[in-house]
From Swiss-Prot:
Transmembrane segments annotated in the record for this chain: 22-42, 69-89, 145-167, 171-193, 251-271, 274-294, 661-681, 703-723, 782-800, 807-823, 885-908, 923-943
Glycosylation positions in this chain: N529, N594, N758, N1004, N1157
One Pfam family, short name: ABC_tran
Protein name: ABC transporter B family member 22
Length: 1229
């Protein structure tokens, strides 16, 4: 029953139209299976006519013509039947796969957040299911299932024909089909288990690749390319070993078909007795024996599809498991109360909670919290104290273990989940945007909003001005995860998304943390206005942003230790809140004395105008909203003309496995030669049946029986050697290709990854899919090709030796058959790039959806994501209709032409016999030889579809491997620095991001950064601050001018060696899916780092204390992108990683923005010590963190407008830009 359920999972996505298509396809496949046994029946009659010498010439030709015409009728019937088979299965395969992708993604988006914490270790899992798994099932439905049905019906039809022709012989031969089934079933079970394990093994490797590509800036910055490739390579070893086991199992399964020869030997012997003692005719004996063996081998061919069925079953089970899973917190459940008039009073009553992924670490033990309706409440406290968990519980991302949460006195468990979330607007600490337009991103907050509402929301969040500067305005693409926007711009768009929702409850989790001072002031005012009349929960580390809230709750270790207004809490001089406030008061008393808030108004009336210009400068948006080129197209222009994808080059990559290639090819040649030898012996044996001497018949029968038994033994042994050898070649070639592709990808310039079509989901999907197709090409198709060439060569040689006249005619018509299947290849290869793009786009959507699942869940945006999926699949679905027609026509033509060629062979052979040019014995030998060879060619022709896919995959592989990298990290003649002093100089630099060459970031830009000194870069969002870091890391090259380090052009360095001397801590902490220890070790130059060094680095970053409180300590799993840790915890680990690197140049891009006050002070002290003696470039919006820097450089519109120390810049007074920035941030207590 379980097996039936598993197989059923493949078809559970069919609707009524698909059932009709599958019904018609079933009729076509069954009819296709009956055609060949019917041909055998007619062939038996023809052979009897030819072998019977009692016919006269006229009578003889009349009988031949009668049966030849019958074959033509069969050919006509096969034309219709095979068209129905080809069209219906191809069409329904695509329809069901498309529906499956939608259902799977819908089910994934339906799951609660806790499911992702426990079951989805990385986005790679979902990408694989959306792309690879659905493709496997589509392939089975479109090609492998109809082949299996045709083979099964051929088995049944063969025995029906056998019983009609000679029931006694058929009964004797009937039990032998079991000999073909038992080995196949045993090996099939092994193949299912191995296939399941291979999929699980590759998940780990796929996850590593996805991280390396999606976090490529971090990988480059820490020189971790080799580490990632080494981890990727090690993760692939398990799947390679399983692949070799799969090769042996397949060799046994296919080799077991050699029992056919032994069966043929026995049946030949028994048939001779039927001729001698029961008056049976030789043609009838041959037809019955070939029906019996064909029926058995048909099942054998069906079992050869077992690998694909096993993969499809595994994929179907995995997909249906997610589809059927009903989450504990079901956003699709319509049941639940909907409050008519919600006021927004929130109450936590004795809540106990711990994350299911870390049950040993309690977050709340007995939390009680009341938030009055219409009031604003701020939650403050140390990083990891449970502030963000309050918001997660309120939105029902999780449910408490004990206690309850009430809204307006009603438990949120009793409320309809979707309605509950629709009443809340969320702005998270790390802004999550989707790879679509700015307008679409804002509409995630309110799907039916008008464009005017979008604009109004953008104005309210101070986003409208910078959006309007883009050539495409609100249609500008933000890139994968918003990569084309600066941090402040992303945050403002996410705030607009929350504002447009007009929620009853507003949830702000560090909503202004990424904004510069001016933007923060304006956005804070907008947020203050938005909170009026709404219940608002604010989480903030910057206490100046929450001093006006109604109530402030101070958290510590999951408990509320203080509650009150700002003024009330400040009265307790020894209180926790007062201590936090003190940490944020600017230490430089000079700034307090000199700054006058009243002086800043005039300055910023002009400054605000400048922001409109500068805010657009750091954008790397798309040049077109409708970019549709695939990865291959994007790469094609960069491939050197002397390097073209070819099968020869692919085989050259298999050179290390040359011994196995030799063994595999020799065994394939031998295996291929077995079939024509068997066919020749069968033809000779038919002539033996027409001998008049029983003694001679017995003697020759004995010889041929021994020959057939010998062929059976050789078939079994050779098959195992052949399949293992080619599996060895395929597995190691696949491993090498994946390693080489990832290695090559990690040499590409960052701007390549900025392109919309080169998203991590799309690349990982191709990495998995293309490599698998290449493995099938080498491990299976090349093997079949070699043995087919061997079989054809031996057959032609034998045929020409027997009778060159008939052989030439029979050989001449073989290309017709081959041509039909070659056309199939061309048809498949002509599938439009829309179909390829559909897979890539689906993978990209899935990757984004999982990465931003909290945002999707919070805004109930599942339907919007599914609409995007439907849009990207519309084109390929239309294309599939045309392809289904072509598939049906080509299949029907090839089948019918094969039957027509048999009729031609009979007619021409009969003419030669009448003319005395050949004997009937020669005709039997040649006919069976070439008909058998024709079927070998036809079976091999079926692989042309796989060859077409393989050709595309090979092209895709070499498109990556041959691409010229604009910024080569391993420049052979590059200067390898032993030590870096850290003198950095920008000389007349012009720069624009490659994805938006028309927007100039820097024009004739120059700046000097002294060695061993600390330089702070400040200015409004989008003024080019982060671009300086990107150029120092050489993520990009300037269009004009030079960036120098230690007086040498940065382009002359060996890039990876140079980056070893540069440490980076980014604005958004980027962690890999691994343990805390592994993440810190990414800062080390080698894989062997002492535990003491790791601990010291963690202590320096104020991370050690919280790490040791975790049950697994440094072995705690961080989750995909550090999802298991709080923002502050992630940032401290990222800082520890930089500390361990001990760099000469330290780049800090908002390094402390995610930390609470106490942690920030301690980390700032650690960074202060780390910066001593090093060149440090610090980007900060919080000016209190940079006032001790040796130099402060103020940027505006890509220009340096001020430069000096904190004191000297303040001395300029109200006319100074820096003075005004400090004024905005001055904390007034």
């Amino acid at each position: 029953m379980k097996s039936f359920g598993s197989v059923r999972s493949i078809f559970m996505h069919a609707n009524s139209v698909d059932l009709v298509l599958m019904g018609l396809g079933l009729i076509g496949a069954v009819g296709d299976g009956f055609i060949t046994p019917i041909i055998f029946f007619i062939t038996g009659l023809l052979l009897n006519d030819i072998g019977d010498s009692s016919f006269g010439d006229k009578t003889f030709m009349h009988a031949i013509m009668k049966n030849a015409v019958a074959l033509l009728y069969v050919a006509g019937a096969s034309l219709v039947i095979c068209f129905v088979e080809g069209y219906c299965w191809t069409r329904t395969g695509e329809r069901q796969a498309s529906r499956m992708r939608e259902k799977y993604l819908r089910a994934v988006l339906r799951q609660d957040v806790g499911y992702f914490d426990l079951h989805v270790t990385s986005t790679s899992d979902v990408i694989t299911s959306v792309s690879s798994d659905t493709l496997v099932i589509q392939d089975v439905l479109s090609e492998k299932l109809p082949n299996f049905l045709m083979s099964a019906s051929a088995f049944v039809a063969s025995y029906i024909v056998g019983f009609i022709m000679l029931w006694r012989l058929t009964i004797v031969g009937f039990p032998f089909f079991i000999l073909l089934l038992i080995p196949g079933l045993m090996c099939g079970r092994a193949l299912i288990n191995i296939s399941r394990k291979i999929r699980e093994e590759y998940n780990e490797a796929g996850s590593i690749a996805e991280q390396a590509i999606s976090l490529v800036r971090t990988v480059y910055a820490f020189g971790s390319e080799r580490k990632m490739i080494s981890k990727f390579s090690a993760a692939l070893e398990g799947s390679v070993k399983l692949g070799l086991r799969q090769g042996i199992a397949k060799g046994i399964a296919i080799g077991s078909n050699g029992v056919t020869y032994a069966i043929w030997g026995f049946m030949t012997w028994y048939g001779s007795r039927m001729v001698m003692y029961h008056g049976a005719k030789g043609g009838t004996i041959f037809a019955v024996i070939i029906c019996i063996t064909y029926g058995g081998t048909s099942l054998g061919r069906g079992l050869s599809n077992l690998k694909y069925f096993s993969e499809a079953v595994v994929a179907g089970e995995r997909i249906i498991e997610v589809i059927k899973r009903v989450p504990d917190i079901d956003s699709d459940n319509p049941r639940g109360q909907v409050l008519e008039n919600i006021k927004g009073e929130v109450q936590f009553k004795h809540v106990k909670f711990m994350y299911s992924s870390r049950p040993e670490t309690p977050i709340f033990d007995d939390l009680c919290l009341r938030i009055p309706s219409g009031k604003s409440v701020a939650l403050v406290g140390g990083s990891g104290s449970g502030k963000s968990t309050v918001i997660s519980l309120l939105q029902r991302f999780y449910d408490p273990i004990v206690g309850e949460i009430l809204i307006d006195g009603v438990s949120i468990k009793k409320l309809q989940v979707k309605w509950l979330r629709s009443q809340m607007g969320l702005v998270s600490q790390e802004p999550a945007l989707f790879a679509t337009s700015i307008e679409e991103n804002i509409l995630f907050g309110k799907e039916d909003a008008s464009f005017d509402e979008v604009v109004e929301a953008a104005k309210s969040s101070n986003a409208h001005d910078f959006i309007s500067q883009f050539p495409l305005g609100y249609k500008t693409q933000v890139g994968e995860r918003g990569v084309q926007m600066s941090g402040g711009q992303k945050q403002r768009i996410s705030i607009a998304r929350a504002i447009i929702k007009s929620p009853t409850l507003l949830l702000l989790d560090e909503a202004t943390s990424a904004l510069d001072s001016e933007s923060e002031r304006v956005v804070q005012e907008a947020l203050d206005n938005a909170t009026i009349g709404r219940t608002t929960i604010v989480i903030a580390h910057r206490l100046s942003t929450i001093r006006n809230v109604d109530v402030i709750c101070v958290f510590k270790n999951g408990q509320i230790v203080e509650t009150g207004s700002h003024e009330e809490l400040m009265e307790n001089v020894d209180g926790q809140y007062t201590s936090l406030v003190r940490l944020q008061i600017m230490e430089n008393e000079e700034s307090n004395d000199n700054v006058s808030v009243s002086m800043r108004e005039g300055q910023f009336s002009n400054f605000n105008k400048d922001v409109k210009y500068s805010s657009r400068l750091s954008i790397q948006s798309r040049s077109s909203l409708f970019a549709t080129s695939s990865i291959d197209t994007n790469l094609a222009g960069s491939i050197p003309k002397d390097k073209k994808p070819s099968f020869k080059r692919l085989m050259a990559m298999n050179k290390p496995e040359w011994k196995h290639a030799l063994y595999g090819c020799l065994s394939a040649v031998l295996y291929g030669a077995l079939h024509p030898i068997y066919a020749y012996a069968s033809g000779s044996m038919v002539s033996v049946y027409f001998l008049t001497s029983h003694d001679e018949m017995k003697e020759k029968t004995r010889i041929y029986v021994l020959l057939f038994v010998g062929l059976a033994v050789l078939c079994f042994l050779i098959s195992i050697i052949q399949q293992y050898s080619f599996a060895y070649m395929g597995e190691y070639l696949t491993k090498r290709i994946r390693e080489n592709i990832l290695s090559k990808l990690l040499t590409f310039e960052v701007s390549w990854f900025d392109e919309d079509e080169n998203s991590s989901g799309s690349i990982c999907s191709r990495l998995a899919k293309d490599a698998n197709v290449v493995r099938s090409l080498v491990g299976e198709r090349v093997s079949l090709l070699v043995q087919t060439i061997s079989a054809v060569s031996v057959a032609c040689t034998l045929g020409l030796a027997i009778s060159w006249k008939l052989s030439i005619v029979m050989i001449a018509i073989q290309p017709v058959v081959v041509g039909c299947f070659y056309t199939q290849r061309i048809v498949l290869k002509s599938i439009s790039k829309k179909a390829i793009k559909a897979q890539d786009e689906s993978s990209k959507l899935a990757a984004e959806a999982v990465s931003n699942i909290r945002t999707i869940t919070a805004f109930s945006s599942q339907e919007r994501i599914l609409k995007l999926l439907k849009m990207v699949q519309e084109g390929p679905q239309r294309e599939n209709i045309r392809q289904s027609w072509l598939a049906g026509i080509v299949l029907a033509t090839s089948r019918s032409l094969m039957t027509c060629t048999s009729a031609l062979n009979y007619w021409y052979g009969a003419r030669l016999i009448i003319d005395g040019k050949i004997t009937s014995k020669a005709f039997f030998e040649l006919f069976i030889l070439f008909v058998s060879t024709g079927r070998v060619i036809a079976d091999a022709g079926a692989m042309t579809m796989d060859l077409a896919k393989g050709s595309d995959a090979v092209g895709s592989v070499f498109a990556v491997l041959d691409r010229y990298t604009n910024i080569e990290p391993e420049k052979p003649d590059g200067f390898v620095p032993q030590n870096i002093k850290g003198q950095i100089k920008f000389v007349n630099v012009d720069f624009a991001y490659p994805t938006r060459p028309d927007v100039i970031i820097f024009k004739n830009f120059s700046i000097d950064i002294d060695e061993g000194k600390s330089t702070a870069i400040v200015g409004p969002s989008g003024s080019g601050k982060s671009t300086i870091i990107g150029l120092i890391e050489r993520f990009y090259d300037p269009l004009k001018g030079i960036v120098k380090i230690d007086g040498r052009d940065i382009r002359s360095y060996h890039l990876r060696s140079l980056r070893q001397h540069i440490g980076l801590v980014s604005q958004e902490p980027i962690l890999f899916a691994g343990t805390i220890r592994e993440n810190i070790m990414y800062g080390g130059a080698s894989d062997k780092i002492d535990e003491s060094e790791i601990i010291e680095a963690a202590k320096a970053a104020n991370a050690h204390d919280f790490i040791v409180t975790l049950s697994d300590g440094y072995d705690t799993y961080c989750g995909d992108r550090g999802v298991q840790l709080s923002g502050g915890q992630k940032q401290r680990i990222a800082i520890a990683r930089a500390v361990l690197k001990n760099p000469s140049v330290l780049l800090l891009d908002e390094a402390t923005s995610a930390l609470d006050n106490q942690s920030e002070r301690m980390v700032q002290d650690a960074l202060g010590r780390l910066m001593v003696g090093r060149t440090s470039v610090v980007i900060a919006h919080r000016l209190s963190t940079i006032q001790n820097c040796d130099t402060i450089t103020v940027l505006d519109k890509g220009k340096v407008v001020e430069c000096g120390t904190h004191s000297s810049l303040l001395a300029k007074g109200p006319t100074g830009v820096y003075f005004s920035l400090v004024s905005l941030q001055r904390t007034r207590y």
